[in-house]
Amino acid sequence: MEGEPSQPPNSSWPLSQNGTNTEATPATNLTFSSYYQHTSPVAAMFIVAYALIFLLCMVGNTLVCFIVLKNRHMHTVTNMFILNLAVSDLLVGIFCMPTTLVDNLITGWPFDNATCKMSGLVQGMSVSASVFTLVAIAVERFRCIVHPFREKLTLRKALVTIAVIWALALLIMCPSAVTLTVTREEHHFMVDARNRSYPLYSCWEAWPEKGMRRVYTTVLFSHIYLAPLALIVVMYARIARKLCQAPGPAPGGEEAADPRASRRRARVVHMLVMVALFFTLSWLPLWALLLLIDYGQLSAPQLHLVTVYAFPFAHWLAFFNSSANPIIYGYFNENFRRGFQAAFRARLCPRPSGSHKEAYSERPGGLLHRRVFVVVRPSDSGLPSESGPSSGAPRPGRLPLRNGRVAHHGLPREGPGCSHLPLTIPAWDI
């Protein structure tokens, strides 16, 4: 969210960079600041840090979108929400990271008014959509695990929920988009290394009264950070309590659920808890600075220190969250990890025709249900969540597994180089 402080980070506050102090001319009441906010080593450090998270964000989240969209077995409720998180992270990487980096390096706002509004709006909508999506994931897991007999959330309802999430994100960020504007700072100029002067512009929220900004910041903090994350904590605490209990009878009078299924569900919950926890910690410093600016009554030197050094780091940490989610998926989830590997292997190994097939078996009642196994080639990517592609997914208690993970059915393991021998993966394992 650009222009966080009541006086924007790059406005008429005294700045000192590159060994050149801000100078004020009493006779004309003019203030001159260095064009760049930091020395060359500090600026280089910021550029490398932002470039790293930008590349991680673009590559990782693009792969997540590719894996989920390419494989219809990944079209599940939880994976649709994960896809929505990846889309919001991509928006942050495309529209917010570059402009924020340049804004943190140069004194003043170097872009036009439209970019000022777009950057602030997209960043605010992305963080709002992310936290609302995390709440939706927690609710969906809560219903599946704590109340397994209730009607499951369908894929269609999940897509409607995602549309509502973005509508709410746009609604709550509209005041910021309206008030964000670029203004010229009177009697304040930037001076470059060749002693050329430039007018100073600032991108900031021009509220009619300062108190209105405080109210809006407090509303944002409570509605898109504090309250949603408190709800997530309660949901996952109930889920953890349920998973720690002994497995009960399966629906339809089936035997007790396979303990391995509970462990798999627990791994899914661990991954989702890590995503929510990392989101909380990543955005906490930026929210703390926003509240400090509005309620702290900082002096000019303190505000200079916060805006020139603290805000760039807080922005970087918040943006790093958008880059870390794919790493969390790959670490905790085997199917996403296989999907990442397959995406890179596909460029080296051509995919043969008919490399993807399904096995079906008839279950009691005369209905054909998708069996536990989905036979895929190594070039195929991940598979759906343990909740299954729909509420009618088979119960994990009846799934024959070998070593609790993958049954190879006597096929040799994949050797060096490219191999097209199929691996059988539990389709319900997220």
Curated annotation (Swiss-Prot):
Name of the protein this chain belongs to: Neuropeptide FF receptor 1
Function of the molecule: Receptor for NPAF (A-18-F-amide) and NPFF (F-8-F-amide) neuropeptides, also known as morphine-modulating peptides. Can also be activated by a variety of naturally occurring or synthetic FMRF-amide like ligands. This receptor mediates its action by association with G proteins that activate a phosphatidylinositol-calcium second messenger system.
GO molecular function annotation: G protein-coupled receptor activity; neuropeptide receptor activity
Native source organism of the sequence: Homo sapiens (Human)
Residue spans of biased composition, Polar residues class: 9-20
Record field: compositional bias (Low complexity): 379-404
Main location: membrane
One GO BP annotation of this record: neuropeptide signaling pathway
GO cellular component, one term: cilium
Gene name per UniProt: NPFFR1
PROSITE patterns given in the database record: G_PROTEIN_RECEP_F1_1, G_PROTEIN_RECEP_F1_2
